[in-house]
Amino acid sequence: MDATAIILAAGEGTRMKSNHCKVSHKILGKPMVQWIVDATIKAGCSRVVVVIGSHADEMRAFIDGAYANSATKVECVEQTERLGTGHAVKVALEACGIAQGPVVVLNGDLPLITADTVAKFAQTVATGELACTVMTMTPPDPFGYGRIKLGADGQIERIIEQKDCTPEQAATLLECNAGCYAFDGAQLAAHIDEIGNDNAQSEYYLPDMLEILKGHGQAVSIFHCDDYRDGLGVNSRIQLAQLTAIARDRINEHWMAEGVTFIDPTQAWIGPDATIGRDTVVWPQTHLIGHVTVGEECQLGPNSRLTDTTVGSGCTIDETIAIEAVIENGVDCGPRAYLRPGTHMLDGSKAGTHVEIKKSTIGEGSKVPHLSYIGDTTMGAGVNVGAGSITCNYDGVHKHKTVIGKDAFIGSDTMMVAPAQIGDGALVAAGSVITEPVPADALGLGRARQVNIEGWAADYRRRLHEDDEV
């Protein structure tokens, strides 16, 4: 679809009381503005223009980074003077040379709008029969929204703001303005300069385009959202929480329909870019953030947080934090495991209780069951690491690697001082400090030999009592 989306994201968002741009606040781990940009891309818009103003540098850096590799052109245009929504659209048109095709203008704080809604909205002006359509909705409580009054011909007669409604209008006019507009690009470009600023705020308001277009004999109509939630915006932290709950419910209901079990769907937070395989069970307080892929027949949670992580099928992820990790099939993690970026758990491996792994590969069937730190390590298949074992990978300046061969056995409370090399089938005695390579099938022993002194303890206690008598 050769349509352009203009996303208005220049506002201060003062009611958020934040040091950051309003539309950068996250819902399920994803900035609001990214929700709406992604919706326009999925809808088939060929170009997306984000109008920025408040915190412009922060917004530009985010948009440029997030969409650097996007097949759809996503660009930022700065509105240096915040002179209203009409002025913001004019700035976008002039900066990008937009003069034809459908143009949809959306607010950057509408994270719940779907790609399907955007596509249908843009299509309303694609034939040229309508110069503009206004997105409308019928929320359960319309208070605060502008009300739509239609004429006998189905065109918009006027938009009546809440403060201007009579009691009868407030009771009978339940269709509300969602604040989004679709334009025929040629008509928009031809008449945008006719918007005036003769109002109390001396601003240029985009809704004035409706009367301007009607004055030129152009048809103006409405596009009604089937789901009113598509048109809900965020102006406060309270609304941010409310829309987060709606997004959560939508996503969880989708995955339940796809064969995923949620023990309590109100207590699981699944991001929009996550995917979950059928017959997986999601326990309470599970968070999937960013690009997370989970296979079939897994147990997720309780109390697990996965960020940009891939999980295979048949895994147990119990009270685990995993960031930028790859977890293959049949892996057991937790409780209270921490998988840091660069961790790769191969099939059937285990990271158990109070285990931290960073930038390491844990071989097929290998186990790190409890109370260990494994960093910058390549571990072969069939390895067992005893409790309290650590790879000492940092010398104060540089990180060093450890290599543990297949079928090695690392005794409890072992310190492997990197760079360390443990050969295939080697055994490292408990309590060892390993500073030299251990050959394959050898015993590595790096501790003082035990000495038993007969009678020493009894003599020691006797001397303590004698001291007390002095």
Regions found by a protein language model. Give the residues of each.
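N-terminal nucleotide-binding beta1-loop-alpha1 segment
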Residues: 1-18
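Short, high-confidence coil segments that cap the C-terminus of an alpha-helix
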Residues: 45, 100, 129-132, 218
